[in-house]
Amino acid sequence: MKILKYLIYISMVSCHLYANSQVTQEIVNLKTRDDVTMRVLLLSPKEPKASLILFAGGHGGLRIFPNGSMQWGENNFLIRTKSIFAELGVNVAIVDAPSDRLRPPFLSGFRNSEEHSKDIKALTILLKNKYSVPIWLVGTSRGTESAASVGIKLQDENDVKGIVLTSSILIGQDGFPVPDMALNTFKKPVLIVHHDKDECRVTKFSDLSKLSSKLNSNNRNEVVIFSEGITQGDACQAMSHHGFNGIEQQVVSKIVDWVIKN
C-alpha cells in the first residue's frame, strides 16, 4: 500500500448543458426499493472515463431541487467540486436521501444499512447500462461511512471498482466509524485522502492510522495527505481544512487521476 433483481423506474426531471464545457446535467428520480425513489444529480462529460458516486457528509439530506440546486449541503466538499470532477472527464452521480428518509435524521443511522446498499445498487445498474465505464464510490466525512459500507456489501457483485475516502470518520460518535468496518475483507483499491491539519473531533489526522492499518494489504491502496489551503469556521465544517478549502482543484485532480489509473 502506498503512504434480488431491481425494477428501475427513471424519471428525467431536467437536463441542460454547462455553458463552458461539454458537461450535461440531469436530475434522475430512480426507483430503488418498493415505493421508494432516490433523486440523483448526474453530471456527464462527453466521453467519460469513469463514473463516481459521491456521498456528501453530515446528515446527507440534500433535498435536490429539479433544477439541480439543493436545500442543504451546497458547501460540502464533494458538492461544491462536482463540476471540477465532471470537467476532468468523469461522470458524477450525487445521491440524495431516499424518499423514505427525506426528513430528519435523513441518512444518519442509515448509512450502514442493507436498504442503503440496495438504493446504491440500483444506481450502479443505471450507470453501468448508461455508460459502461468503471464505477467508484467516493465519500467525504460522514459520507465515507456510506462509501465504505456500500463498497464492502457490493464488492462481490462486481458493481464497484473501488472506493475513495476523504476526511474519513475515524472514531465512534453518532455513527459507524470507518475503521470499525470490515475493510480487511475489501479486495479492491482504496484511496484515502486526508488533510494533516484536520482537527475535526471525529476525523483528526492523528487518528488516521486507525484506518490505514485496517486496509487489505493485497490491494492497490494509497494514502494521500494534503497540507496546504485555508481554514474558516468550525473544524468539522466544509470550509475548514476538513473540507480542503482552497485546494479543491488539487484534491479533485488527484482523485480523478488515481481512479482512472486504477
Model-identified regions with their sequence ranges:
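Short, surface-exposed "cap/lid" segments of acyl-processing enzymes
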Residues: 45-84
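N-terminal cap/lid segment of alpha/beta-hydrolase-fold proteins
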Residues: 21-47
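Primarily recognizes the serine-hydrolase "nucleophile elbow" in alpha/beta-hydrolase
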Residues: 125-185
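Sec-dependent N-terminal signal peptides
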Residues: 3-15
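C-terminal catalytic histidine-bearing segment of alpha/beta-hydrolase fold enzymes
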Residues: 218-262
